């Protein structure tokens, strides 16, 4: 995930989430190891305000707790439709307890010079726009909309690069071969 990538490159990463929303333990361990090896840092807290303090970049993103994803996977394997409905209901109830975990203008004022870059992989739950109570206020999203859309525009290329890197033993050689071949992909 993104926290492992950022810690790998020596960034100071503060991960904040409400209690009960833990991530995959291996990801957390990897992020900690990368931070140690790169000279960065990895801090975990349960306060959005604490994580935003003096931050250069914020990347607030909602997720389901790892334990919920484990339960969901098991229910899917069993094809337990009723169990999935009950789990979804419990998740919505749990999420309702944390509606204050929204990236707002007030949070952004806590960042370095009150001007941190807001990032999001999209789509975002935008309060009063795409939902009643979301993960980011309309004001914050609007201020950073262009930057966020540019960021999202890179996703297809990053995904393609990851596929190439994992499917071919020597991706550079493969790309060079394709370029030399100069085969047109669309034939009319």
Where does each model-flagged region fall?
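Glycine-rich phosphate/diphosphate-binding loop of Rossmann-like nucleotide-binding domains
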Residues: 1-74, 78
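ADP-ribose/adenylate-binding Rossmann-like module
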Residues: 71-132
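Conserved active-site and cofactor/substrate-binding residues in soluble primary-metabolism enzymes
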Residues: 1, 23-26, 46, 53, ...
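Glycine-rich loops and low-complexity Gly/Arg-rich segments
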Residues: 14, 38-42, 69, 82-85, ...
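Hydrophobic/aromatic ligand-binding patch that stacks against planar heteroaromatic rings
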Residues: 5, 107, 139-140
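Adenosine-phosphate binding glycine-rich loop
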Residues: 111-188
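Hydrophobic alpha-helical scaffolding
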Residues: 45, 94-101, 148-152
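Broad structural signal for hydrophobic residues in well-ordered alpha-helices, predominantly aliphatic
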Residues: 31-34, 107-108, 162
């Amino acid at each position: 995930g993104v926290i492992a990538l950022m810690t790998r490159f020596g960034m100071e990463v503060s991960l904040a989430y409400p209690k009960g929303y833990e991530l995959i333990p291996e990801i957390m361990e990897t992020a900690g190891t990368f931070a140690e090896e790169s000279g960065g840092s990895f801090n975990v807290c349960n306060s959005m305000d604490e994580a935003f303090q003096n931050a250069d970049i914020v990347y607030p993103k909602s997720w389901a707790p790892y334990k919920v994803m484990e339960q969901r996977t098991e229910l899917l394997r069993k094809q337990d439709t009723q169990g999935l409905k009950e789990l979804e209901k419990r998740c919505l109830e749990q999420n309702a307890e944390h509606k204050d975990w929204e990236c707002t203008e007030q949070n952004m004022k806590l960042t370095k010079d009150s001007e941190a870059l807001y990032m999001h992989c999209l789509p975002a739950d935008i309060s009063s726009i795409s939902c009643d109570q979301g993960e980011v206020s309309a004001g914050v999203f609007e201020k950073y909309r262009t930057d966020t859309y540019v960021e999202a525009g890179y996703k297809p290329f990053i995904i393609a690069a990851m596929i190439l890197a994992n499917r071919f033993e020597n991706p550079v050689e493969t790309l060079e071969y394709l370029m030399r071949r100069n085969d047109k992909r669309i034939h009319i």
